[in-house]
């Protein structure tokens, strides 16, 4: 371990999480991101280097990665952009999709979560729980009060699924007026009514956001690079779901 990398938790089963700014680990995360996002959204992501999902925000972020210690493979990743680093970067990533003035008025430190993905073979409760527990530990250690980020939904069916999920989340998990944002590129509305009676298949990562206590901040945005719909979500870090807070506090005591 070097000065660019800090271990956050003990291995859970065969998995380990670390927070890093180490270039080779960030590149491995960028390769996983490309694989997952290009397959799920059917887009080359506007990549300038084949097989790598990278942007100008990566160098300002802390990157949380999950590694399988049996194989050495990186199996999950997300990145966190703290408010102070966002100012150096010219703003948050999500400011390219939403008008965020309401969130800048929040009383406390804000950080942005982004590029969250999990290897298809590791999309289980253990991996996701470890990812969120490590994230909770990081946020508390950095005195972050609010977490924002984009929750993405694929558009392979032309938008019906995205609108059904968006409407469901707005009904069940809509944030208060003080958290509302406006999309810069609003997702085009369907020409027919979205049924509210049929079951809604919410993506696993978005379910995890809601379990953490996240809330949806308004209407969805269209992301042309990823060919997906994005919803801006906000999480009051003080309201982290109890099972995640207990998890990281237990690790601290060990």
Explain the meaning of each model-derived region.
Residues 73, 126, 241-245:
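Short, conserved charged micro-motifs
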Residues 6-82:
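Short amphipathic alpha-helix that is part of the acyltransferase structural core
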Residues 1-10, 254:
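Basic/polar N-terminal segments that are highly enriched at the extreme N-terminus
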Residues 53-55, 161-165, 231-235:
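Short low-complexity, flexible loop/linker segments enriched in glycine and/or proline
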Residues 61, 228-232:
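Short hydrophobic/aromatic beta-strand or adjacent loop that forms the aromatic wall/cage
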